[in-house]
Amino acid sequence: MANITAALVKELREKTGAGVMDAKKALVEVEGDMGKAIELLREKGMAKAAKKADRVAAEGLTGVYVDGNVAAIVEVNAETDFVAKNAQFVDLVNETAKVIAEGKPANNEEALALKTAAGDTLEAAYVNATATIGEKISFRRFALVEKADKQVFGAYQHNGGKIGVITVLEGENTDEALAKQLAMHVAAMNPSVLSYKELSEEFIHDELAQMNHKIEQDNESRAMVDKPALPLLKYGSKGQLTDEVVAQAEEDIKAELKAEGKPEKIWDKIIPGKMARFFLDNTKVDQQYTLLSQVYIMDDSKTVEAYMESVNGKVISFVRFEVGEGIEKAANDFENEVAATMAAALNK
């Protein structure tokens, strides 16, 4: 029988990340052959990963890495928030972002086939992490963002990496600091798209209906305390404000000023403010979902678009990942697991 020394166990642990007892058992089983022990642990790790494959992993972290004119953002999931703070998990997330930024894969399959600094594939790294950490660790998604030489990246991670953002700006007065500030805005305000031009007519119609339903509910409450009803929204996006609609709004304002007896010589001073209010009141969908139409959190006197124009800058693109978005968390996973274990025991 081979002599399994502490130094041998330590070496195997350093190479595989296995626990002390797992490393020792593997060495004993293969009579101290390091190569066979590594292979054995990998096989056992794959078996452990397979057993955990159907679990829901909805916690985790985002990772962001910038490499010249290419930036990568990734989401990696674990089953619990506790594991998401594990140093091995954090290192895996960061390495995943770096490997993807440098390798530029087209999809998840290509990403998982990329090699890590240790020489293994990313897929093998995830199998190993699942085995050694003891939870299902899964690579969920990534996005690659490219920029031109004269453009700048902004990278920001919020709440310890629960939200990750990459922005791209261009303009003589834009820099990484401004791009990062905009990334902070994106993290906080969660826009869905850059411009109102990206919203479909159906989406605007549905959102407007929901907003008006909320106004109707509020009006019922206002009526109970003798407050005047709020008007329903007719429009929700700049895309609906055609030249004819805008011209009619201006005519309505002029008619209102005339009815109020305001002298025509001061109309030019009043109309711009009222038209600005008209646009504000009739672009509520844009303000909620489009970055350029949102009020900029660093200067609440301007929209993002207006602020960027004031510094001769332009937003080219952005990507925002939030951990777990779109994943349905099963609250009774643990209960189901216990029940399944008990059922299996009774059927033996």
From Swiss-Prot:
Signal peptide: none
Keyword Lipid metabolism set for record: no
Subcellular localization, as worded in the UniProt entry: Cytoplasm
A GO term from the CC aspect: cytoplasm
One Gene Ontology MF term: translation elongation factor activity
Superkingdom of the organism of origin: Bacteria
Pfam families: EF_TS (PF00889)
Keyword Protein biosynthesis listed: yes
Chief location category: cytoplasm
Region (Involved in Mg(2+) ion dislocation from EF-Tu): 80-83
Keywords: Cytoplasm, Elongation factor, Protein biosynthesis
NCBIfam families the UniProt entry points to: tsf
Protein purpose: Associates with the EF-Tu.GDP complex and induces the exchange of GDP to GTP. It remains bound to the aminoacyl-tRNA.EF-Tu.GTP complex up to the GTP hydrolysis stage on the ribosome.
Family membership noted in the UniProt record: Belongs to the EF-Ts family.
PANTHER family in UniProt: ELONGATION FACTOR TS, ELONGATION FACTOR TS, MITOCHONDRIAL
The protein's name: Elongation factor Ts
Organism whose genome encodes this protein: Streptococcus mutans serotype c (strain ATCC 700610 / UA159)
